[in-house]
């Protein structure tokens, strides 16, 4: 039987697999903010990135290892393909962390071996123990993954897993890389590994899954029943294609249905001991932080963290909830940190009050960043009577958590109406302060603004998404704009908030342009799609 830590270990891969969502690229400061909040949330392992991808990714993992890793904090993990160059970069990046892990992987399905790796099973059998052993020279804690395990020959999996454990892997991860498997099949796969790998008792069994068929969470819960004790998941379920298993859904399923899952851990059904180490009251805060910084909007009907998760429209439901919330709610909103508390910040509030509230929301800003956020706060407070938590979150994500800006928006003016052709005048300043102005016509004010910005940037970009939502209530509410641009197949997002949605749209477009330029310089490689060019 696989090693059992007595509870479920939560392995968060928001900063690695989650960041692979189209348009969700994060800069260094954003990654640090999310990593710090994940530590407060109580995750056991943070997969901080793929260090070999680029110098920027290496630096981000290294900084997280330095600033977030600690004796009492989470294990800091880096991803590495089964190559010495990848593993060496990963080992060096995570070195500052007192608790660290190298997560190395290789594809094991026949379709991946033939068409991606162009290697035989015999070659992979030689590679796996050698690379796990090499990873052990950098970190005592090594995890090995069989990429596309769900479509691999089980007997081949058993052989590779036994070799990896013998070489020193303490965690064996079984990924459903393309979201193909069903819960009963996944349970049988985990059970088969548990029964047919002779040394499986020396390792913890982990699972990783994608949501292409909407089954990721269900698959994981079935895997737990069959012996899996580590779940690799992301905040809000973000990730490539249809995303990953959602951390908040898994944790709350284990929390709410604890009496059902307790016996699978050898516990009494009514044992009150939590099945994870997650501080559930931090879930909503973490969800909003990730949504704000990635620009990935949470769907309103998303379980646990969606805007409608605790809303009731039906009169019958409303009546029942007013009499007793348990009639239609299985989760207390306060359990996940959702409260009706309204902060009383306004134009007379001082810097200390703003800083204190930002810290409560999970933002640990430098002095310069705090000054910038406070200036934006005062500007907004002159236009709004009351500033809410969502306003503060919008200020920080739009004003502070941005990559080094190639362009600064100086001015935006539009003229439009029933008899006027929409016209926009935009002024941008570059890094040395030189200003340029452009005028453009469009089908509407936002289209005109985007065309003017493209002319100043010197390249045309494909606008694939423009969305506006109200951050708070009232006629003076901030309008938050999200814009996604596509250039050469890559997607970059920008978001901004303002009481004037046209100004917000202009700033969001500039933020997306700056992010595009920032990541074009990094030019990171993809851990699964790019072939290994380094020598094994």
Swiss-Prot record:
GO terms for molecular function: 2-isopropylmalate synthase activity; acetyl-CoA C-acetyltransferase activity; manganese ion binding. Keywords: Amino-acid biosynthesis, Branched-chain amino acid biosynthesis, Cytoplasm, Leucine biosynthesis, Manganese, Metal-binding, Transferase. GO terms for cellular component: cytoplasm. InterPro entries: 2-IPM_HCS-like, 2-isopropylmalate_synth_dimer, AIPM/Hcit_synth_CS, Aldolase_TIM, LeuA/HCS_post-cat, LeuA_allosteric_dom_sf, LeuA_bact_synth, PYR_CT. SMART domains: LeuA_dimer. Mn(2+) binds at residues 17, 208, 210, 244. Pathway: Amino-acid biosynthesis; L-leucine biosynthesis; L-leucine from 3-methyl-2-oxobutanoate: step 1/4. CDD domains: DRE_TIM_IPMS (cd07940). It catalyses: 3-methyl-2-oxobutanoate + acetyl-CoA + H2O = (2S)-2-isopropylmalate + CoA + H(+). Residues 8-273 form the Pyruvate carboxyltransferase domain. The keyword Amino-acid biosynthesis applies. Catalyzes the condensation of the acetyl group of acetyl-CoA with 3-methyl-2-oxobutanoate (2-ketoisovalerate) to form 3-carboxy-3-hydroxy-4-methylpentanoate (2-isopropylmalate). Belongs to the alpha-IPM synthase/homocitrate synthase family. LeuA type 1 subfamily. Homodimer. This is 2-isopropylmalate synthase. It comes from Prochlorococcus marinus (strain MIT 9211). The lineage of its organism: Bacteria, Bacillati, Cyanobacteriota, Cyanophyceae, Synechococcales. The gene is leuA.
């Amino acid at each position: 039987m696989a090693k059992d830590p007595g509870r479920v270990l939560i392995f968060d891969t928001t900063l690695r697999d989650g960041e692979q969502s189209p348009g969700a690229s994060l800069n260094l400061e954003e990654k640090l903010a999310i990593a710090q909040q994940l530590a407060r949330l109580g995750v056991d392992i943070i997969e901080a990135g793929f260090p070999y991808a680029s110098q920027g990714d290496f630096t981000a993992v290294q900084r997280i290892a330095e600033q977030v890793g600690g004796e009492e904090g989470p294990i800091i993990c880096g991803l590495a393909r089964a190559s010495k160059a990848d593993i060496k970069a990963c080992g060096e990046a995570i070195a500052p962390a007192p608790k660290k892990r190298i997560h190395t992987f290789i594809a094991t399905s026949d379709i991946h071996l033939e068409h991606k790796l162009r290697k035989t099973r015999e070659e992979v059998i030689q590679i796996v123990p050698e690379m796990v052993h090499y990873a052990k020279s950098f970190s005592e804690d090594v995890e090995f993954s069989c990429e596309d395990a769900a479509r691999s020959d089980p007997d081949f999996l058993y052989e590779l897993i036994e070799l990896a454990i013998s070489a020193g892997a303490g965690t064996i991860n079984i990924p459903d890389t393309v979201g193909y498997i069903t819960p009963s099949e996944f349970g049988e796969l985990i059970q088969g590994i548990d029964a047919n790998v002779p040394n499986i008792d020396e390792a913890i069994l982990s699972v990783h899954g994608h949501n292409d068929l909407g089954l990721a969470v269900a698959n994981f819960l079935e895997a737990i029943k069959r012996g899996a004790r580590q779940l690799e998941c992301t905040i809000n379920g973000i990730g490539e294609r249809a995303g990953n298993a959602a951390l908040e859904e898994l944790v709350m399923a284990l929390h709410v249905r604890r009496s059902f899952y307790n016996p699978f851990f050898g516990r009494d059904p009514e044992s009150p001991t939590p099945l994870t180490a997650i501080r559930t009251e931090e879930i909503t805060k973490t969800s909003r932080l990730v949504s704000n910084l990635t620009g990935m909007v949470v769907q309103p009907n998303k379980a646990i963290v969606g805007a409608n998760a605790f809303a009731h429209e039906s009169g019958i439901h409303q009546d029942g909830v007013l009499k007793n919330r348990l009639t239609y709610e299985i989760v207390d909103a306060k359990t996940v940190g959702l409260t009706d508390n309204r902060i009383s910040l306004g134009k007379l509030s001082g810097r200390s009050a703003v800083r204190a509230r930002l810290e409560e929301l999970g933002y640990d800003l430098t002095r310069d960043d705090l000054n910038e956020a406070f200036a934006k706060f005062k500007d907004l407070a002159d236009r709004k009577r009351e500033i809410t938590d969502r306003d503060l979150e919008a200020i920080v994500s739009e004003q502070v958590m941005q990559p080094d800006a190639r362009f600064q928006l100086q001015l935006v003016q539009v003229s439009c109406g029933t008899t006027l052709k929409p016209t926009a005048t935009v002024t941008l300043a570059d890094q040395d302060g030189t200003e340029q102005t452009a005028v453009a016509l469009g089908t509407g004010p936002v289209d005109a603004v985007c065309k003017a910005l493209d002319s100043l940037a010197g390249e045309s970009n494909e606008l694939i998404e423009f969305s506006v939502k109200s951050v708070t209530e009232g006629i003076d509410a901030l309008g938050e704009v999200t814009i996604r641009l596509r250039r050469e197949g890559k997607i970059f997002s920008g978001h901004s908030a303002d009481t004037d949605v046209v100004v917000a749209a202009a700033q969001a477009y500039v933020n997306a342009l700056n992010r595009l330029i920032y990541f074009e310089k990094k030019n990171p490689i993809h851990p699964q799609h790019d072939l290994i060019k380094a020598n094994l």
